[in-house]
Amino acid sequence: MKLANWCWLSSTVLATYGFLVVANNETEEIKDEAAQNACRVRLESRGRCEEEGECPYQVNLPPLTIQLPKQFSRIEEVFKEVQNLKEIVNSLKKTCQDCKLQADDSRDPGRNGLLLPGTGAPGETGDNRVRELEGEVNKLSSDLKNAKEEIDVLQGRLEKLNLVNMNNIEQYVDSKVANLTFVVNSLDGKCSSKCPRQEQIQSLPVQQHLIYKDCSEYYTIGKRSSELYRVTPEPRNSSFEVFCDMETMAGGWTVLQARVDGSTNFTRTWQDYKVGFGNLRREFWLGNDKIHLLTKSKDMILRIDLEDFNGIKLYALYDHFYVANEFLKYRLHIGNYNGTAGDALRFSKHYNHDLKFFTTPDRDNDRYPSGNCGLYYSSGWWFDACLSANLNGKYYHQKYRGVRNGIFWGTWPGISEAQPGGYKSSFKEVKMMIRPKHFKP
C-alpha cells in the first residue's frame, strides 16, 4: 500500500471510513494558500509488510503518534475493488442498453428506414438474431445482478472494518489526550518558589477532600435532594456543577439536558455546545466536553423522559451511552433500547443517530449531502441525514406549522400522522440523564 502522507489519505481512505478528522479552529481558519497545502501530519511505515499483506503504519500528529491497526492497509484494497466493480457495472449497463436497441431494430427493421443486411424483409435470419441478442441481454442482466451482490458484500465488509478501526482509534486517542492533559496540568501547577523541606511537609495538617465522579456517588453517601452538586469525573480535569435527579427510578441520575419552558435558546454554535449553556435549574445543555468526561469515566446508561401538552408521559432507556471527545466530533454511541416512547434514535437504516457525529448550525458533520441539518433544524444534535429525533429543537408552547424544527421524537404516538391544518406536535418537557450501568440504590 503506497501512501505518501496523511493529506492524500484523508481524501481517499478515510473518506470510506465515513468520518473526517476534526482539526483545531486555528487550522480551519488558515487563509494562506501555501499554508493550506502544507501538511504536518504524516503517515509512516513502522516495518515490513507481512505475508498476508498487512502492513504496520503510524500517524504522526504532533505531539501525538498514533499506531494504526495492521488491517488498515486493507482499506485501500477493498476501496479499489468497489471502484472496479462499479466501473464494470456501468459498462454492463451500457452494453445492455446497446443490446436492447439492437433487439428492437431487429424486430422492426423498417422502423428507421433500414433493413437487415442481405434481406428485403424480416425473416428467419432476423428472428435468430433477435433471439441471440435476447440471450446476450439475459446473460448481461445476470452478470449485472451478480456484480451488485458482490458490491453489497464488499461494502458490508468495509463498514465492519471501519467500525472496528474507528473504535480502536477513539480509545487510543482518548488515552493520549488524557495523558497530555495530565502533563500540561502538572506543569501549570508547579510552584515558582522553592519547595518546602520534608519536615515542613510532615508538619502540615492533613486535609481530606473527597471527589465524587457523578450523582450516583452522592446518592450512595446518603444525599437524597434533587439539587446542584459538584462532580469530578476525572481528577486530571477541573470539577464542575451538575443537577442531580435523586427521585426518578431510584435516583442517582446526572442530568445532561432539560427543556421545561423555552427560556433558553438552543440555536447555538459549536463552541456553545462544547462548553454548555443555560440554567442548570431550568433549561440547559451541560456541554459536550463534560458529557464526554462523564461517559468516559464509567459505563453509563441513558434515560430520556418526555411529556407532551396532552399530559402523556413516556420514556426511553438505553443500556449504554458514550460520547467521544471533540477530536472525534463528539461521536455518539448508544446501546439497546427499552421503554415506552419508542426507539427514535435508531428509527431505521436511513435515520439512525447511533455512531453519528455532532452537528451545529456552524459546523456540518452530518450525512446529508445537500446541506447542514443543524442549520436547517436550528439546533445542535447527532444528525444522520437528517433526523428521527432531535431533543434540542426549538421549544414551541403549542402545535406549529412549517419546518419540523421543534423538539422531535419520531416514535411518539401519532406524531407522524397528518394533523388538521398541517400542524406539528410539540413537547412540554424533556430531560436527558445518565447513571452508571451497575448502580445499585
UniProtKB/Swiss-Prot annotation:
Q: Report quaternary structure and partners.
A: Homotetramer; disulfide-linked.
Q: Which UniProt keywords apply?
A: Coiled coil, Disulfide bond, Glycoprotein, Secreted, Signal
In the record, what terms sit under GO molecular function?
peptidase activator activity
Where on this protein are sugars attached? N25, N179, N237, N265, N338
Report the InterPro entries cross-referenced here: Fibrinogen-like_C, Fibrinogen_a/b/g_C_1, Fibrinogen_a/b/g_C_dom, Fibrinogen_C-term_domain, Fibrinogen_CS
Superkingdom to which the source organism belongs = Eukaryota
Q: Which residues form the signal peptide?
A: 1-15
Where is this protein found? Secreted
- Using the record's annotation, list all stretches that form the Fibrinogen C-terminal domain: 206-438
Its name, as the record gives it, is: Fibroleukin
GO CC, one annotated term: cell surface
Q: Pfam families of this UniProt entry?
A: Fibrinogen_C (PF00147)
As for what it does, the entry says: May play a role in physiologic lymphocyte functions at mucosal sites.
Q: What is the lineage of its organism?
A: Eukaryota, Metazoa, Chordata, Craniata, Vertebrata
Encoding gene, per UniProt annotation: FGL2
- What organism, scientifically named, is this protein from? Bos taurus
What ranges does the record give for the region Disordered, renumbered to this chain? 102-128
